[in-house]
């Protein structure tokens, strides 16, 4: 992979981190825990929560475990992102999104000992999440699309 493409994928990761941290800072500055504000009626609200667990608050309070998993996941994603054997735009974009999401939540865990969540979908019963979580989810979907439908053709 050329250095320009490597830089592009790192920029994608960086944009995820910046957007995630800026929205989290906005929420912390303007909301109290539990406060809710409708953004798009019937679609999206901001609800400020502090999550000291993982998805659905599993493993609540297990910070050492989250640190180790985050560091290992970052290492694995970087390995695949920069390994010339695994090169595909969809795959690499997915990995860049996952990397940005992992780092975005890792920053919270290191600094605050919890993750700030705020995005609530009002049209479906779903947990409150953040931009980093969204990037990880979309990134994993892109990686799976590549692995299931494209990788055999490469």
Curated annotation (Swiss-Prot):
Going by the record, the broad EC class of this enzyme is hydrolase
Q: Where are the transmembrane segments?
A: 8-28, 58-78, 88-108, 131-151
Query: What are its E.C. numbers?
Result: 3.4.23.36
Alphabetized InterPro entries for the sequence? Peptidase_A8 (IPR001872)
The compartments listed are: Cell membrane
Per the UniProt entry, what are the Gene Ontology biological process annotations, in alphabetical order? proteolysis
Pathway linked to the protein: Protein modification; lipoprotein biosynthesis (signal peptide cleavage)
List the active site: 117, 133
Q: What keyword terms does UniProt attach to this protein?
A: Aspartyl protease, Cell membrane, Hydrolase, Membrane, Protease, Transmembrane, Transmembrane helix
Q: Which GO terms describe its cellular component?
A: plasma membrane
Family according to the record: Belongs to the peptidase A8 family.
Protein's name in the database = Lipoprotein signal peptidase
Species the sequence originates in? Lactobacillus johnsonii (strain CNCM I-12250 / La1 / NCC 533)
